[in-house]
Amino acid sequence: GSFVLAESLYTAASGARYINALASAAIAPVVEHPPEGRPPRILEIGSGTGGTTAALVDRLAGSGTEYWFTDVSDAFLARAHERFGAHVALQTAVFDADRPGPEQGLPASSFDIVTAANALHASRNLSTASSRVRQQIAPGGFLLLVETTTHHAWFDVSTGLIEGWQHFEDDLRAEVPLLSTSAWREALLVGGFEEIVSFPPEDSVAAEMGQRVILARVT
């Protein structure tokens, strides 16, 4: 089937454009000041239709960045090569955040940024998944999350119908898989991350969208 409708949903909506622009700005320092002796290396988890990927790749074009586009399903991988292969050094792979990366063929401690857009909350145990994701990040690197932090009732008849929506098994969540910004901070601290910040600010008008960009550092 066609991915065009889903791609439009995750890129054209005003809220998506705003939050993806924040995520794109967050990766700028890695592009402007790449690691010595090699191009930047980025791993995206749960890439799906590539809504956030598109914004990041626009920022990365011409930088020589090695970009790993991964998803728990292989259904999106061929389309990713069509859309993004000419702009970055693209690698694609099936990846499940509930399993250790190295056993799935991902090199440990080697990515300058690991990013996930509304994907990491799908993990069964967030503290465990956060710790495993941390193991993929090089010292000094970052985790960049885009996450919905507010649950709305209409989710129950949309995303709530997706298989796996309720399969979480940790103490951080009771009824829905989404976490507040403060709960994300707790999960990431347990996972070994430091210097955790989020945007937009809690008291801003933009925060009413219920979406956050969360940055966390590995030292």
Where are the language model's segments positioned?
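4′-phosphopantetheine-dependent carrier domains
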Residues: 1-219
